[in-house]
C-alpha cells in the first residue's frame, strides 16, 4: 500500500527535487497482485511456477494431469507468510477455499528456492548489482539463515526480464530452480528483509543510492561479492564465510 502511494505520486516527488526510488504505478500494481504478475510473466515467456486463481481451473488442470499435489497456496495480495500453506490433498484445498479467509492463488510446489537482491539504476534503468543467496532457514516469511552463491544463469535470467518492468532502486526477488532453469516467483520492489546479508558481503546499495542522488549513473557490477558467505540470524546477526565456519567447527 505504501509503495502504491509513492508510485502514484512519482512525478510530484521529482518536481520538488526528491528522487523517488520506487517503481512506476503499473509495475507496483503488478508486484502487489501475485496472480496478475503470473499472467504478465506467462504472456511474456518468463519462467514462473504454474499458478491458478479459481479452484475449478485448478481442478480441471489436476484431472488432466497438468499439476500434482502437494501445492502451495497463498493470498493473492498477501505479504510475508500470512495465509500461506503447503496443501497435500484436494479435500484440504477445498476446505481452505470454503473458509474464504483469503483470496487465494494455487501454485505448483517447487523446491530449490533462492532469492536475489538487485539494484536498478535510476538513470540508466539497468540492473547494476545483483546479490544471490540460497535459503537455509526461513521464519515468519523471511530468510533467517542464508548462504551467498553465484550463478551466471541466474544473473542472465534477471537481466532478460528486467526490461518488462519500470523499477528504480533496490528490489528483492524470489526464485525456484528446477532441471537447470530458474523460475521467477515474486518481486518485492523494496529492500528485502535479508538485505543485510548483501551489505555484510560487501554489496553496498547505499553507495549506489548516493550516486543517483548526486546525479551519477552507476556502473554495472553484477556478482561483485564472495561466494560462501553466510548470514546466520538469531536474536542478533552473524555474517561469516563458510570456510571460516568450518574452520571454527574443526578447531
State where each predicted segment sits.
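Non-catalytic, C-terminal membrane-associated alpha-helical segments of glycosyltransferases
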Residues: 24, 235-251
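ATP-grasp fold ATP-binding core
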Residues: 41, 65-82, 102-112, 130-134
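Short acidic-hydrophobic, aromatic-tinged amphipathic segments that line or gate anion-handling sites
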Residues: 51-56, 85-88
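ATP-dependent carboxylate/phosphate-activation module, predominantly the ATP-grasp catalytic core
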Residues: 91, 97-98, 106-170, 177, ...
Amino acid at each position: 500500500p505504501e509503495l502504491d502511494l509513492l508510485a502514484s505520486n512519482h512525478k510530484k516527488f521529482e518536481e520538488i527535487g526528491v528522487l523517488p526510488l520506487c517503481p512506476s504505478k503499473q509495475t507496483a500494481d503488478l508486484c502487489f497482485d501475485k496472480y496478475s504478475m503470473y499472467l504478465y510473466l506467462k504472456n511474456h515467456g518468463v519462467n514462473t511456477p504454474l499458478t491458478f486463481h479459481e479452484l475449478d481451473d485448478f481442478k480441471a488442470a489436476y484431472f488432466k494431469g497438468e499439476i500434482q499435489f502437494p501445492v502451495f497456496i497463498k493470498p493473492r495480495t498477501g505479504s510475508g507468510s500470512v495465509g500461506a500453506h503447503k496443501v497435500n490433498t484436494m479435500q484440504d484445498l477445498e476446505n481452505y477455499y470454503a473458509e474464504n479467509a483469503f483470496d487465494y492463488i494455487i501454485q505448483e510446489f517447487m523446491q530449490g528456492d533462492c532469492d536475489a537482491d538487485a539494484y536498478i539504476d535510476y538513470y540508466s534503468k539497468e540492473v547494476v548489482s545483483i546479490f544471490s543467496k540460497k535459503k537455509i532457514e526461513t521464519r515468519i516469511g523471511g530468510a533467517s539463515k542464508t548462504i551467498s552463491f553465484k550463478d551466471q544463469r541466474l544473473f542472465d535470467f534477471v537481466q532478460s526480464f528486467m526490461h518488462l518492468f519500470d523499477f528504480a532502486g533496490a528490489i528483492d526477488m524470489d526464485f525456484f530452480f528446477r532441471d537447470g532453469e530458474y523460475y521467477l516467483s515474486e518481486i518485492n520492489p523494496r529492500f528485502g528483509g535479508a538485505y543485510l546479508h548483501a551489505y555484510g558481503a560487501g554489496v553496498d546499495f547505499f553507495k549506489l543510492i548516493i550516486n543517483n542522488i548526486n546525479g551519477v549513473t552507476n556502473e554495472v557490477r553484477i556478482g561483485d561479492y564472495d561466494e560462501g558467505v553466510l548470514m546466520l540470524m538469531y536474536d542478533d546477526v552473524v555474517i561469516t564465510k563458510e570456510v571460516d565456519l568450518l574452520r571454527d567447527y574443526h578447531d
